[in-house]
């Protein structure tokens, strides 16, 4: 109840229209807390992992990435999702498959053109117990994936989101307006979802295959709005009751090629950001817990 005094008709209208809205729901007189048992630590030696890598025109980064990905659990699957490259990215990946037969490297080509489509294809194709998503630009050291593995195995998080805004970045890692935009979106998402977010567009994130299957249907509610693929995953994880954890990662300039995320103009970036904020507000009120 948002209006503590009973006023015929008005009390009902206010409660129906506003009481469940983000931020305003914190002002209601009734609060529900849902608790569950603490998840016991997983046996890391029995778990497997899949590292999903989205790439487009990243020929020079492929081999360094393959060599840098750590072994997680008893088996690590490396999945490349290629997005219509104009250079020799596909040829390079095929070469890595032949050159490193001891590594379980797989290549799939996305039918769509946006990163969200690539991530979803990777999630669906992956066979590991823990799914880690990483962009191929080497702006984040692949060794940092180990922190996400440890967080999941220990029970610290069920959806683990990387954040680039905690540690000091190397120069020219991220345009200033993108940094401000990321912090702004984080400040919007925190009260909307009741989970702390300082970076909503980090290229490194992790979720178990089991939990992904649980929230996949809710992700479809947001897929048409977000071309990046981050927001559907964040919303579905938070609304699905998953334990969210943020892990700081070091961020540096990409090693090769041009950034796909920052190639648009200042105004275009914020136009898209505003669209996603509106989507967040509307859909967060409609999305129900699983």
Which stretches of residues belong to each language-model region?
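Hydrophobic helical membrane-anchoring modules
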Residues: 8-54, 60, 64-67, 71, ...
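Short loop->beta transition adjacent to catalytic acidic/histidine clusters or analogous donor-positioning motifs
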Residues: 47-50, 70-80, 102-106
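Donor nucleotide-sugar binding loop of glycosyltransferases
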Residues: 58-61, 85, 141
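Conserved donor nucleotide-binding strand/loop of the catalytic core
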Residues: 76, 90-125
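Acceptor/aglycone-binding surface of glycosyltransferases and processive sugar-polymer synthases
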Residues: 108-125, 130-133, 142-223, 254-270, ...
């Amino acid at each position: 109840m948002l209006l503590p005094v009973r006023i015929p008709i008005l009390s009902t209208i206010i409660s129906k229209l506003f009481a469940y809205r983000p931020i305003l729901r914190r002002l209601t007189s009734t609060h529900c807390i849902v608790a569950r048992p603490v998840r016991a630590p997983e046996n890391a030696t029995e778990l497997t992992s899949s590292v999903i890598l989205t790439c487009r025109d990243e020929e020079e980064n492929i081999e360094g990435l393959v060599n840098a990905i750590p072994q997680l659990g008893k088996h690590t699957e490396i999945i490349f999702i290629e997005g219509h490259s104009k250079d020799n990215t596909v040829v390079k990946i095929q070469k890595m498959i032949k050159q490193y037969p001891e590594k379980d490297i797989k290549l799939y080509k996305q039918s769509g053109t946006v990163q969200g489509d690539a991530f979803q294809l990777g999630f669906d194709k992956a066979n590991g117990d823990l799914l880690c998503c990483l962009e191929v630009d080497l702006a984040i050291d692949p060794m940092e994936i180990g922190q996400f593995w440890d967080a999941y195995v220990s029970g610290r998080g069920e959806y683990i989101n990387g954040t680039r805004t905690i540690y000091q970045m190397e120069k020219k890692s991220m345009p200033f307006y993108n940094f401000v935009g990321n912090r702004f979106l984080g400040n919007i998402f925190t009260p909307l979802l009741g989970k702390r977010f300082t970076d909503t567009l980090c290229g490194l994130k992790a979720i178990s295959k089991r939990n992904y299957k649980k929230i996949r249907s809710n992700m479809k509610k947001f897929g048409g709005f977000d071309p990046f693929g981050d927001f559907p995953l964040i919303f579905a994880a938070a609304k699905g009751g998953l334990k969210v954890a943020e892990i700081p990662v070091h961020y540096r300039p990409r090693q090769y090629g041009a950034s796909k995320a920052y190639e648009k103009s200042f105004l275009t970036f914020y136009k898209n950001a505003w669209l996603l904020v509106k989507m967040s507000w509307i859909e967060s009120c409609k999305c129900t817990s699983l």
